[in-house]
Amino acid sequence: MASLIYRQLLTNSYSVDLHDEIEQIGSEKTQNVTVNPGPFAQTRYAPVNWGHGEINDSTTVEPILDGPYQPTTFTPPIDYWILINSNTNGVVYESTNNSDFWTAVVAVEPHVNPVDRQYTVFGENKQFNVRNDSDKWKFLEMFRSSSQNEFYNRRTLTSHTKLVGILKYGGRIWTFHGETPRATTDSSNTANLNDISIIVHSEFYIIPRSQESKCNEYINNGLPPIQNTRNVVPLSLSSRSIQYKRAQVNEDITISKTSLWKEMQYNSDIIIRFKFGNSIVKLGGLGYKWSEISFKAANYQYNYLRDGEQVTAHTTCSVNGVNNFSYNGGSLPTDFSVSRYEVIKENSYVYVDYWDDSKAFRNMVYVRSLAANLNSVKCTGGSYNFSLPVGAWPVMNGGAVSLHFAGVTLSTQFTDFVSLNSLRFRFSLTVDEPSFSILRTRTVNLYGLPAANPNNGNEYYEISGRFSLISLVPTNDDYQTPIMNSVTVRQDLERQLTDLREEFNSLSQEIAMSQLIDLALLPLDMFSMFSGIKSTIDLTKSMATSVMKKFRKSKLATSISEMTNSLSDAASSASRSVSIRSNISTISNLTNVSNDVSNVTNSLNDISTQTSTISKKLRLREMITQTEGMSFDDISAAVLKTKIDMSTQIGKNTLPDIVTEASEKFIPKRSYRILKDDEVMEINTEGKVFAYKIDTLNEVPFDVNKFAELVTNSPVISAIIDFKTLKNLNDNYGITRIEALNLIKSNPNVLRNFINQNNPIIRNRIEQLILQCKL
């Protein structure tokens, strides 16, 4: 029977090729490596607390005293004081709008008697009479309102700081006058304030009007001492100008930089290619029924050109929020039906995880300001033929949805060997023409994209667009930040096993019971068990070796060597002892033997606490004394074989773990029985024991002494149809003594007859056992 595979594994699991041992030792070898951090490192170890480095925010901090700037000609901004630091006599500045405002300020040194001096203002030679009888400098504001008029002295500033100010604000020109340290402001009217420009002949500063009190302080008391050192060098005014630059489609921009970290903005155009994955599962039987048509994640790798450079990209497409439909053509075995098929519609989402080999994805750990803009794409379904044995084939055809970009987040893609930090693009859906239908059925004019043929023969769907993100990366491009989701080979294997476990568990509903019992009666060996995997004979042999190497460490294999001694010890304990014996390593844990049969009920409470150990011992006992009846391991092995054949993810690396886990975890709730004359003694893993008569199925007291004696001499039988199911079957349908005996012995032919008759009680029991075959 099918459980032969487990007995073969128990027998051969200790024979392992030397090559496999050497390979295992090599993979487990470790080596200490000392890395020279280089001359610029301050420590050999990575920082315990990773800092974010310099952070740019949206707040602009405007300096109070901006400058000094070199002499120049420009149009001063409105609301800003121009503070001019005069260092010699002569013209300090000239300002005009060439319409109604001309003014020039000339500096006169202390102790100057009245004298006529020549000045060049606005390209003209002018003679002004000046005088200064104070100890401070005088700044004469010469003004005219027309190019035809002569200049006259409108205001005078007497200053020891040699600072002059001019401001454009409120439709007027403001300047300082009076004597420091009590100089004040005054203004002049003009009809054209915006066009007023200035020619500055000395170093100057720029101060916002919001800081006018500071400007007043500087005029009256002088600049801060630091501004009067030789280390302050005036710059060109052009250095103050902000260069507004729009980011290009494909550009890497350094935003900020510190000694260890820098912020990089990556702007890239991308081409996203993806395809849908699907799974179509056909039910067993005559071939007219399908179990499931569903979407599944699909990977796609491709190359494309970006600005003349070839890019290697990897995408994973998955769906969320699917809608479940079904079609049932009738109750007859030859009526076409689909138990469940998935359709994506307006309430669904499509996720596409994208990665490429550009620098943007190299250190994608600390990311902000993530944005994207993508085009839409229409996905149209194709045709799928339901190949029936006889008659015209139904055809699922059509269906369409349009994908619209709805957001982007960070994600992780898993390949066979590595994990990739990726961008997950989320798409919302709208249904589109054409509708889909199943030809030759009543299913017509439905909208959405069914999972039967979502790619419609296309290798991929394509979306173009661009994304932008700011990533915190090491300043030295030779370093990489630790990828939080990077995995070792073993961790990746765990991920594969997790996916495979989920797939295995989901396949339980797709196993046909009639085929399962037929498969359970076959003598499955290594080759037939693994032949469902697409591989060569050599690979199957290698798989068998790998399975045996893994299986020898299983709980089942390590328990087999102790079984015989345990059973012998249990028998002697039951026959000799009149007091409680507790030995965890032996089957004496079965009972608390008592000479007083009336105390059997009390002893059952102790039995219930030890059934986990009991079931393991009885399982091993059953495997050695196999009867003609079907066992739990026959069903377990048959389900394992069926799921291996159905699985799309099974492989050489995952098969050993799956087979070993199946031997330990499939059907955890088991019942075993021992048959003696017309009495049956049964025990299950839930802590319950039963003793009953075959003829009437009426319970009798459970004799622990008798059970302990029989367990070493009588065959142990898997209670495929347990006592509760037998009782239910007899109460509702009535069964003969022969039928009851065959069900107690787990006769496969009788089980098959009940299932073929669609007996709901037997069918439900077998279905529950299949559903217990989970990892």
UniProtKB/Swiss-Prot annotation:
Residues 388-408 are annotated as: Hydrophobic. Residues 509-775 are annotated as: Spike foot. Disulfide bonds join 317-379. A motif (YGL motif) lies at residues 447-449. One of its GO terms (biological process) is permeabilization of host organelle membrane involved in viral entry into host cell. Residues 483-510 form a coiled coil. A motif (DGE motif) lies at residues 307-309. Residues 65-223 are annotated as: Spike head. Pfam families: Rota_VP4_MID (PF17477), VP4_haemagglut (PF00426), VP4_helical (PF17478). Keywords: Capsid protein, Coiled coil, Disulfide bond, Hemagglutinin, Host cell membrane, Host cytoplasm, Host cytoskeleton, Host endoplasmic reticulum, Host membrane, Host-virus interaction, Membrane, Outer capsid protein, Viral attachment to host cell, Viral penetration into host cytoplasm, Viral penetration via permeabilization of host membrane, Virion, Virus entry into host cell. The record marks 230-231, 240-241, 246-247 as: Cleavage. A motif (KID motif) lies at residues 643-645. One of its GO terms (cellular component) is viral outer capsid. It comes from the Viruses. The keyword Coiled coil applies. Residues 247-478 are annotated as: Spike body and stalk (antigen domain). The keyword Metal-binding does not apply. This strain probably does not use sialic acid to attach to the host cell. Belongs to the rotavirus VP4 family. This is Outer capsid protein VP4. It comes from Rotavirus A (isolate RVA/Human/United States/WI61/1983/G9P1A[8]).
